[in-house]
Amino acid sequence: MTIKQLPQYFVCLVFLWACSDNNPTQSVKKPEKEAVEVPDFNADSAYLYIQQQVDFGPRFISSKGWQQCGDFLVKKLKTYTRYVEEQNHPIKTYDGKSHTLRNIIASFSPKKNNRILLCAHWDTRHVADHDVERQNEPILGANDGGSGVGVLIELARLLSKQESRIGVDIILFDAEDYGNPNGDGKGPISWCIGSQYWGNNPHTTDYYAQYGILLDMVAAKDARFTHEGLSRTYAQRILKKVWSEAHRLGYGSYFVYQSTPQIIDDHYFVNTLIFQP
C-alpha cells in the first residue's frame, strides 16, 4: 500500500485504463457469445503461493529475501509461460541508497493484439511505520505484497492450461512500497518506483491493453472492494462489469457499491504514463 492509506478494512483492487466504445447507440442485435469453459481458480494454490513468498522473509528491495523471492517468482512463472522477462534498472531511493530495480513480466499469447494487463507489486515495506510497535522493522507482507502476486501466479497456472482468446500480460512491480515514511513534500514521488519505470519504459514498443487490473492487499479477512476514485475516472465500464459479476456469483458482501477517494498506487502511474485518455 502506498501514499494515501485506506482504512484497514478496505483493500486495493483498482483498475487501469479501459478503452471505450465510441460507436453511436443503436438497436443492433448482438451475436450470441460462444460459451467458454473457464477453469476453476484454486484458492488453496493462491494461498500456498503467498506462503512461499512469506517464507523468504521481508522482501524489500536489495534484501536477501527480495533476491531469493525474485528468483523464485521468475522460475515459477517460467513453468507456465516461456515469455518471462525482467526489467533491471539502477535506481536511488529516498534515503540515498542505490539499488537495481527488478520488475518481472510474464506474457501469454504475446502476438495477440487484443490484450489485458494484470499486475501487483511483489516487494514489501522496509519499515512497519503504520504499526504501533516495532515501527523500524520490515514487514513480512503476506497481504501487502504477497497476496496480489499469489493470485496472479494462480491465474498464470490456469492460463497455461488453456489458451485464451486474448493476450494477457502479468507484471509484478518492484519497489512499490519503498516510499518515504515522512512524506515526499514537493519532491518526486518516492513510492511505486517499478510502475513509474515501466510507465516510461514499457516492455514492448507502443504497449496497449484493453484494460488492466491491479491487485494489492486482496487477502484481508472480511475484505471490502470499493469503487476507488481513479478507477472510476479511467475504467468505469470495467468497474461495473466486475462488480456485477461478483454480485451474480454471490460475493456482493466483498464487492460493495461504495465510492472511495483516489489513492496513489501503481495504477496511478500506469494510467497517467501509458493509458492517458
Q: Where are the language model's segments positioned?
A:
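Sec-dependent signal peptide recognition
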Residues: 4-12
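Solvent-exposed loop/turn segments at secondary-structure junctions
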Residues: 60-61, 90-93, 111-112, 122-126, ...
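C-terminal motif of bacterial Sec signal peptides marking the signal peptidase cleavage site
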Residues: 15-18
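Sec-dependent signal peptide cleavage junction
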Residues: 20-51
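Zn-dependent metallopeptidase/amidohydrolase metal-coordination segment
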Residues: 257-277
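A non-catalytic alpha/beta surface segment that caps or lines the substrate-entry region
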Residues: 48, 52, 58-111
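Extracytoplasmic/secreted proteins, especially bacterial periplasmic and envelope-associated proteins
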Residues: 45-55, 68, 72-79, 147-154, ...
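Acidic/histidine-rich catalytic neighborhood of metal-dependent amide-processing enzymes
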Residues: 137-237, 262, 266-267
